[in-house]
């Protein structure tokens, strides 16, 4: 085994099989961080995780079956019961998922009975090797098939890859496939490619890796998840997919799968999240002019909304720590929502309104909004628990322009940049002469 270690074991070398593992005894498995494990006895943790994984697969299957049942059920009176079933099975499978993932965290915690950083590192490096291995293999497969030299895996995560099949679809059906064939037929074709070609190839590729590493048991497998006709990545782990089929559940209308963007973040006002999702749907099927009209119309609607609906939700902590007893009510570097909370409390006391309204306390959920200056509070922000006291007279000072920019336009501009669209019509010299 010293012969193996002396070659410098790491993920990059194992990916290219540049480490000779022929000297490794048959009853020993190597992990990418250079650790060795015996194979004559199965450890309690792998055995326990295997049982949990089987349970999760069972509940996940029931969850997906219920989702498809909901898609096919036209009777609204029956849909409620199906939705309850979906929620139950989803909660059960997610609970199992959290339990499975927590095993890695436990191995890296000094308070765990079997804490060992070598074990935790073995898990992370094995994950890196597995996902990068299949990424390379799939790129090789697609390049050999299409006689190209490019990357077809456009992104990868800890346990998944994102593969573009547009070139394959064009080769089989022609470049005008979007015009002459329904999208559902293209999705059917992609589904067959994944099930009949890619999944068996992935299984074969992982067997090759398992044999090379002399694993205890080959458990690595990949199943097709989402089939989409369009997708956008704004950054790593921040993307949108226009999904027609998710893990075998075929949607009557495409569903947006959104990861890491403001539209799914609780720090974005709920009314704004709804409009963000509407705009993303329009981006997927509309034009730049449609988007510009949508933004213009929503801006008018936005300015008519009450401050409570357009303000940022936050949890507030550190009111006492950031408060100042001098002429400045807060110290330098105070977070903006905490600054607003300090101002809110100060003026409640100054205006003797503490019997009518409660002070903001540590740990409470609040909202904050930007103010136009000058204003009675001589500051640029106000926070509040539910609504702004009418006695403050601040409603007319809410900076709707800045709120619109911060809550809606700036986050959506990132998505518009991906497709090269402008939020507003830009006049050009060429357009002037037309």
Predicted regions and their residues:
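DNA-dependent DNA polymerase catalytic subunits
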Residues: 1-33, 40, 48, 67-88, ...
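Short glycine-rich loop/turn motifs that provide flexible caps or phosphate-binding loops at active sites
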Residues: 42, 104-107, 419
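Core alpha/beta catalytic barrel or barrel-like domain that forms the active/cofactor pocket
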Residues: 104-110, 153-162
């Amino acid at each position: 085994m010293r012969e193996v270690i002396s070659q410098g074991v790491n993920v990059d070398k194992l990916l290219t099989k540049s480490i000779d593992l022929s000297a490794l005894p048959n009853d020993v498995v190597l992990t990418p961080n250079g650790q060795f494990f015996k194979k004559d006895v199965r450890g309690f943790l792998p055995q326990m995780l295997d049982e949990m994984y089987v349970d999760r697969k069972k509940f996940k299957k029931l969850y997906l079956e219920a989702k498809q049942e909901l898609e096919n059920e036209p009777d609204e009176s029956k849909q409620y019961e199906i939705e309850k079933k979906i929620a139950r099975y989803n909660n059960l499978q997610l609970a199992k998922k959290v339990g499975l993932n927590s095993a890695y965290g436990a191995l890296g915690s000094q308070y765990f009975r079997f804490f060992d950083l070598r074990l935790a590192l073995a898990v992370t490096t094995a994950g890196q090797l597995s996902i990068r291995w299949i990424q390379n293999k799939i790129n090789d497969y697609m390049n050999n098939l299409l006689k190209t030299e490019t990357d077809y895996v456009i992104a990868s995560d800890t346990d998944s890859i994102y593969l573009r099949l547009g070139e394959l679809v064009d080769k089989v059906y022609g470049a005008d496939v979007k015009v002459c064939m329904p999208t559902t037929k293209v999705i059917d074709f992609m589904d067959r490619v994944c099930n009949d070609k890619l999944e068996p190839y992935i299984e074969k590729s992982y067997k090759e890796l398992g044999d090379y590493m002399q694993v205890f048991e080959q458990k690595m497998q990949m199943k097709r998840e989402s089939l989409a006709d369009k997708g956008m990545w704004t950054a790593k782990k921040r993307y949108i997919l226009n999904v027609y089929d998710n893990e075998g559940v075929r949607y009557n209308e495409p569903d947006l799968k959104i990861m890491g963007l403001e539209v799914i973040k609780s720090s974005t006002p709920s009314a704004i999240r709804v409009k963000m999702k509407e705009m993303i749907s329009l981006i997927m099927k509309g034009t730049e002019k449609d988007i510009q009209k949508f933004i213009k119309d929503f801006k008018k609607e936005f300015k008519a909304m009450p401050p409570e609906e357009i303000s940022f939700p936050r949890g507030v902590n550190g009111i006492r720590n950031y408060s100042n007893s001098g002429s400045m009510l807060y110290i330098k570097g105070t977070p903006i929502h905490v600054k607003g909370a300090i101002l809110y409390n100060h003026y409640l006391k100054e205006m003797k309104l503490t019997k009518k309204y409660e002070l903001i306390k540590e740990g409470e959920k609040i909202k904050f909004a930007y103010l136009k200056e000058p204003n009675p509070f001589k500051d640029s922000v106000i926070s509040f628990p539910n609504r702004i006291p009418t006695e403050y007279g601040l409603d007319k000072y809410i900076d709707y322009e800045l709120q619109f920019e911060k809550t809606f336009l700036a986050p959506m501009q990132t998505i518009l940049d991906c497709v090269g669209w402008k939020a507003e019509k830009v006049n050009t010299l060429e357009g002037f002469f037309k």
